[in-house]
Amino acid sequence: MTDLLTTRLPRRTVLQAAAVGAVGICPALRALVHAQGSDAPEKKEVKIGFIPLTDCASVVMASVLGFDKKHGVTIVPSKEASWAGVRDKLVNGELDFAHVLYGLVYGVHLGLAGPKKDMAVLMTLNRNGQGLTLSKALADKGATHLAGLAALMKKEPREYTFAQTFPTGTHAMWLYYWLASAGIDPFKDVKCIVVPPPQMVANMRVGNMDGF
């Protein structure tokens, strides 16, 4: 065991460290933390997975504009096809980091619907921004809002299909909550499927789903 836990620091230094805890470590503590190590990056090259959505911009542009170089690392962006693929590559080590859904991180950390592995959220890339979309076919029949959708489903009963991008993602949670608020059971009254974000519009166009 090192002396890190037993080293006595002035009260003023400890209070300063607490004040900046959200953004970094005070110099006195940093010196102790790195007494046995180095400030050099653990890896010179880091592979970061992303799905082509607007909130991946921070990752992609950091590489394009060379922001990574001043920190002594090289970012290798890796375009992925689905959130499930990103999850699997994070778990097996093919990716070092990834642009992911908050719910995906917690799902992996808790071992929900797959292998359990410790995860950490290092940066927030967006704050919500999701939207719920209904097909033009439904809109043409008056389903331009939730009440209209509920009325149409009662008037024309059939299997209605809605898509979300990942079972533990906020998209799924918002969709389920939205449907349930109108008395529509998202697990019994409609069919819910998983579709990767880049494939949503194409699936809507060919009629594979009624909304997402």
Task: Locate predicted features.
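Short, glycine-/small- and polar/acidic-enriched structural segments
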Residues: 36-187, 191-195, 210-211
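N-terminal export signals
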Residues: 13-33
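Loop-centered beta-sheet repeat module
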Residues: 200-212
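Short amphipathic alpha-helical segments with coiled-coil-like heptad repeat character
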Residues: 1, 23, 74-78
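N-terminal secretory signal peptides
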Residues: 1-13, 22
